[in-house]
Curated annotation (Swiss-Prot):
Coiled coil: none annotated. SUPFAM superfamilies: Ribosomal protein L13. Keywords: Ribonucleoprotein, Ribosomal protein. This is Large ribosomal subunit protein uL13. The keyword Ribosomal protein applies. HAMAP family: Ribosomal_uL13 (MF_01366). This protein is one of the early assembly proteins of the 50S ribosomal subunit, although it is not seen to bind rRNA by itself. It is important during the early stages of 50S assembly. One of its GO terms (cellular component) is cytosolic large ribosomal subunit. It comes from the Bacteria. GO terms for biological process: negative regulation of translation; translation. It comes from Rhodococcus opacus (strain B4). InterPro entries: Ribosomal_uL13 (IPR005822), Ribosomal_uL13_bac-type (IPR005823), Ribosomal_uL13_CS (IPR023563), Ribosomal_uL13_sf (IPR036899).
């Protein structure tokens, strides 16, 4: 008997909604990345996009542990001499909290075509409202110790 190999068409996708209020950013990103990749399913295969859709709400209320709010910096470069720009995590969280959460989750996905396809199933919103109520998302609870 041959081993079952999942195909992309065989996958049934569900929608999960995660409330990021007071959840540590890294722990949130790990759980979201596992749901996106499909590692919670018995039919997981690393070469197949078999994951679910993930909607993260309240990204502006995510917890940043330690001194990272002021002490950790995010960098990008324009390509021109002297074009290095840096912002602290606190500045990014105040201005674009959805981008900060999305960058944390996408950083835990594969860096190839499959990873880019998987990252398109991630939806992040700064507030409590999202336009995906028609998909009937299932609430996903992240278990953590209180800070």
């Amino acid at each position: 008997m041959s081993t079952y190999t999942p195909k992309a068409g065989d996958v049934t996708r569900t929608w999960h909604v995660i409330d990021a209020t007071d959840v540590v950013l890294g722990r949130l990103a790990v759980q979201a990345a596992n749901l996106l990749r499909g590692k919670h399913k018995p039919t997981f295969a690393p070469h197949v996009d078999g994951g679910d859709f993930v909607v993260i709400i309240n990204a502006d209320k995510v917890a940043i542990s330690g001194n990272k709010r002021e002490g950790k910096f995010l960098y990008h470069h324009s390509g021109h001499p002297g074009g290095l720009k840096s912002r602290s995590v606190g500045e990014v969280l105040d201005k674009n909290p959805d981008r900060l959460v999305e960058k944390a989750v996408v950083g835990m996905l594969p860096k190839n075509k499959l990873g880019r396809a998987i990252s398109s199933k991630l939806k992040v919103y700064a507030g409590p409202n999202h336009p995906h109520a028609a998909q009937q998302p299932v609430p996903f609870e992240i278990k953590q110790v209180a800070q």
